[in-house]
A protein has these predicted regions:
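Conserved alpha-helical scaffold flanking the Walker A/P-loop in AAA+ ATPase domains
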Residues: 204-208, 262-268, 278-301, 334
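Walker A/P-loop
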Residues: 210, 215-258, 323
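AAA+/SF3 P-loop NTPase mechanochemical coupling elements
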Residues: 269-270, 288-298, 328-349, 359, ...
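Substrate-gripping "pore-loop 1 plus following alpha2 helix"
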Residues: 315-337, 356-374
Length: 383
């Protein structure tokens, strides 16, 4: 008995189609999974077996082989649980194979058969719909996110029993078609008009905002550097529709997209602490997730206390500042994320912060040089 179900794996902000193949044949009762899988995907075997048992499905005492194709692509994430379970049910004859034709599935299972939300639903639905796939079965909590793609037929489910009952009817239905692109205005910008005085600095910020130029403010504590930076997004041009979609994809991958049927319409403002790690700043980790520079895409990346960032960390921004993207490599995977941000740097004029007020500043000339040398010249050139 053979069956196949379509799903997808994320590659940057794009989705690559994956076929979940299941073969149930005579032999020793073994459950094998192959196809270049990470540990979290291999763990799906136990989740699927227990979830099926909890809904009253007894696996046959035969050899069950699950293959995630193509095998040259690393499979990551927990969204393969639902496709694997449905593929097994199809091979067993519980679900009609014709009912899941031209349908993409994604979702995580817990041990009692509930469907849990997964990250990255928006790029999966968007790319699969552009490839001609019109029907999608996804977790109920991700339903509104999937409906952001106009024309896509979304079926949100909360339990494995919903899948079995739906397909027993031998006809796929959805509640309604995809919704038009609405916008999300959940963040209210701090108003740039709140800045009093500072005529020269305000003019410099306006020029920087007009052309998405990087800017560095150097001044003593309490001069208003942070206040000005926080109000920078309010004078940036509005996001275009393509920019909203691209930004929403990034936030969907990170699980930060609000499930309220709307795309992000606000320019992001990211303010990482100077103790941030390399993976958190530029991206990385086991799944190679986007970092702060990608979350600041089409917005402002504010680096306060610029000279206090760990040695070499700022130099990692050289390529993104020029290429407006970041290329990450880990464990044989190469992922590219957008990173077109306005870098807003702020720092004190010296270690104590009061130079050139010689009545308060106690920094020597060598101390001043060492302080400014913490920010490399290539980074200064790009600002």
């Amino acid at each position: 008995m053979y069956s196949t179900v379509r799903t997808a794996v994320l590659d940057g902000i794009s989705a690559i189609p994956v076929q979940v193949e299941v073969d149930i044949s005579t032999g020793m009762p073994v459950f094998d999974m192959v196809g270049n899988l990470t540990s979290e995907v291999r763990e799906a075997k136990e989740r699927v077996k227990t979830a099926l048992h909890s809904v009253g499905i007894v696996l046959p005492a035969k050899r069950i082989t699950v293959n995630l194709s193509p095998a040259n692509i690393k499979k990551t994430g927990t969204g393969f649980d639902l496709p694997i379970a449905v593929a097994i049910l199809t091979a067993m004859g519980v679900i009609d194979a014709d009912s899941i034709k031209d349908c993409t599935l994604a979702g995580e299972l817990n041990l009692n058969g509930e469907i849990l939300p997964v990250s990255g639903i928006l790029p999966i639905v968007f790319d699969e719909y552009n490839k001609g796939i019109g029907k999608f079965i996804i977790p109920k909590q991700n339903e509104n996110e999937g409906r952001l793609v106009c024309g896509a037929k979304i079926f949100g489910i909360s339990h494995l029993n919903d899948v079995i009952a739906q397909f027993d009817e031998a006809a796929f239905t959805c509640q309604k078609t995809g919704m038009a692109h609405e916008v999300q205005m959940d963040e209210k910008y701090a108003d740039f008009c709140d800045v009093n005085g500072q005529k020269f600095i305000k003019r410099a910020c306006e020029v920087a905002a007009g052309g998405m130029h990087n800017i560095l403010l150097v001044g003593p504590p309490g001069a208003g550097k942070t206040m000005i930076a926080e109000r920078m997004p309010s004078i940036l041009p509005p996001l275009s529709e393509n920019e909203r979609l691209e930004l929403s994809k990034i936030y969907s991958i990170c699980g930060l997209l609000d499930n309220d049927s709307s795309l992000r319409d606000n320019r992001p403002f990211r303010n990482p602490h100077y103790s941030v790690t390399q993976a958190a700043l530029i991206g990385g980790g086991t799944r190679i997730n986007p970092g702060e520079i990608s979350l600041a895409h089409n917005g402002v990346l504010f680096l306060d206390e610029l000279a206090e960032f760990k040695g070499g960390l700022l130099d990692l921004l050289r390529a993104p500042l020029e290429e407006h993207c970041i290329r990450l490599s880990r464990a044989g995977r190469n992922v590219t994320y957008p990173a077109n941000f306005l870098l807003f740097g702020a720092m004190n004029p010296c270690s104590c912060g009061y130079y050139p007020d010689m009545q308060r500043c106690r920094c020597s000339e060598p101390t001043l040089r060492r302080y400014f040398d913490k920010v490399s010249q290539p980074i200064i050139d790009r600002i």
